[in-house]
């Protein structure tokens, strides 16, 4: 976990708490073993860490899912987690970046809904206008 001091004014500082995660691989099976229960335990632990440590920003740096076309159950687990932690932590912001196991377009598809929950997703690298 990274604690980053940010100077707002010369005499006023705040601390921003950033929690960086990656490689969740929701929906993964390991040699035929379904890891759904493990993923649920992890997400519950993560939600509790966010609450207890008053995290300001959660970064999910790729491989949210194990495959580019995840099951409905895996997607449901993902969206329920985002809804839960943003509802329980009104100042939390989430940034998600697609990894090589993720479908960038699939992660970005519900962007307007995710933005309503203070969540930004970047899956596709876009070229700047004029350059």
Model-derived features: where do they sit?
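N-terminal active-site segment of His-dependent metallophosphoesterases
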Residues: 3-82, 90-91
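Binuclear metal-dependent hydrolase catalytic cores
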Residues: 11-16, 85-92, 102, 107-131
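Metal-dependent catalytic neighborhoods of phosphoester/phosphodiester hydrolases
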Residues: 31, 64-82, 98-117, 123
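Low-complexity, flexible helical/coil segments
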Residues: 53-58, 93-99, 130-131
């Amino acid at each position: 976990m990274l604690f980053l001091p940010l100077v707002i004014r010369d005499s006023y500082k705040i601390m921003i708490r950033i929690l960086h995660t990656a490689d969740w691989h929701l929906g993964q099976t390991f040699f035929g073993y379904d890891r759904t229960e493990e993923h649920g335990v992890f997400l519950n632990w993560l939600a509790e860490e966010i609450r207890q440590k008053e995290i300001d920003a959660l970064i999910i740096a790729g491989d949210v899912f194990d495959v580019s076309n995840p099951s409905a159950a895996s997607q449901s687990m993902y969206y329920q987690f985002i809804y839960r932690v943003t509802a329980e932590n009104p100042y939390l912001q989430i940034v998600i970046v697609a990894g090589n196991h993720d479908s960038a377009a699939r992660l970005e598809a519900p962007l307007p809904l995710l933005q309503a929950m203070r969540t930004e997703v970047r899956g596709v690298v876009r070229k700047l206008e004029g350059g």
